[in-house]
Amino acid sequence: MNRCKGRNSSFLKKERQKINFISQDMGCLVSKPADSGGNRRRPGNIGEVYVYVPGLRIPKPVDFSLTLGDHLSKNIVERLSALRTRIVVMAGQEGPTITRTRRKTATQHGGSTLADLQQALEDYLPVLLGLVKDGNQLQHKVQFAWINQEDDLEETAMSNAWYEVLSVLHLMAMLSLSQANLLLLPRTSADGYQPKLSEESRRASIDIFVKAAGYLDCAVRHVLPQLPAEFRRNLPVDLAEGVLRALCLQALGQGVDIQLGMAIDSTKATLAVKRRLACEMVKYWQQAQDNIMNLPLSNGWGEKHRLFVKWKYIEAKAAAYYYHGLILDEGNTEKSHGMAVAALQAADEYLKESKKACEAFNSATPLSRNPPLFGTMKYLSEKIPKDASSKVRINRDLYSFEKIVETAPTLPDFALALKPDEFQLPGVDPSWNEENINRGQVGSKQLKSDQR
């Protein structure tokens, strides 16, 4: 196999026994096996989880001066270096602990840490995009390396700036989901009794979910297509199209979950509104599951991600069948009452299954636990068993879970209303315009000198 060319060849030679790489015409891809040790730090316990974040990919240092020093001005090289180094340091320090959702951390430090790192990424992105503007050939000069979380390979490096853009958007989305998780952990009320979640926090979380979905949607529609097919095939599973789509749908599904909880608390929301939200939630989670079903999510973070989606999909079906059953029960025919009973029984069974799925998720490494119930599931965990038992007159012990689900009426199909934020890649930083002007002046002077 051919070796990647460039100034880092001596390093690659030293590392050849533990690094596999694939030569590309436009750059090189480097993947370090999971057992090579060292960089990937995983917590044994991530505490309370309402929004699952499958770890944070951490960037490794890059020396821009080595690869770009002969091609760009000192100003641009130093800006790229300073902005990315800031991210490397912050992500390296906070990444392994940022998913630790201790309530103290969430209220005193977590928010500012997330916001600072998010701002650092937003500052870096416009400058980074100068490397890919108008097919800039410099996009293949720098090898960008990131530590993976869901992939079996510990790290992946590619000599393509679009890979760096993709990694930045993914990290921005994961930080947003982390922020939503911290926001949705109920705080102990002033009277010291039942933990509560404010209306303001719930509304803010929906905005964050939509924003996270926007980053991921942009990554899938506008960044992935920029990578050559060979690069896309060799992306870590963290950045696979299926995982990106699943995370986008997960964010929207959890946003609708919050909307449903708010509808439950509202005296103005009708049963029809609640059923529609619950049925939409089922579709989001079903599509999320379809996207990751056949992906190699086998290690800790990846397997836990799969279990989270499975749990939330089952939980959503419990909610949808419950509200569908209540509406069917409003009918005046014997058939509608029979269908209502079947729907409520299915809701009860799905609720039981969701509790098993929840236990499987929390017991998978890294370990986690549920925050105090609130919103949708707090209400439904009390109402479903009660309403199902009052409506169901048959001996449910005679029926298996599979039989009950088979006889349940079909859920209505609604168009999905909650959409990702229309995030667009920012314009290239103005410093690149100055760079082009300066380069043009240098080229003009050189041409006149040659003509003499």
Predicted region positions:
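Short coil/linker segments at helix-helix boundaries
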Residues: D151, M158, S178-D238, I258-E280, ...
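Long, amphipathic alpha-helical regulatory blocks in the mid-to-C-terminal portion
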Residues: L216-C218, H222-V223, R276-P296, A347, ...
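Extended ligand-binding groove/face enriched in aromatic
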Residues: L138-L175, C218-Q226
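Eukaryotic intrinsically disordered, low-complexity segments enriched for acidic and Ser/Thr/Pro residues
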Residues: F21-M158, T188, D238, S266-V273, ...
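Intrinsically disordered, low-complexity basic segments at termini and long loops, enriched
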Residues: M1-Q24
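Alpha-helical solenoid scaffolds
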Residues: Q119, A161-E164, R203, D207, ...
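Amphipathic alpha-helical repeat scaffolds of TPR domains
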Residues: L166-R187, V243-G261, K312, A316-L326
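Acidic, Ser/Thr-rich intrinsically disordered and amphipathic helical segments
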Residues: A82, D116, D123, M172, ...
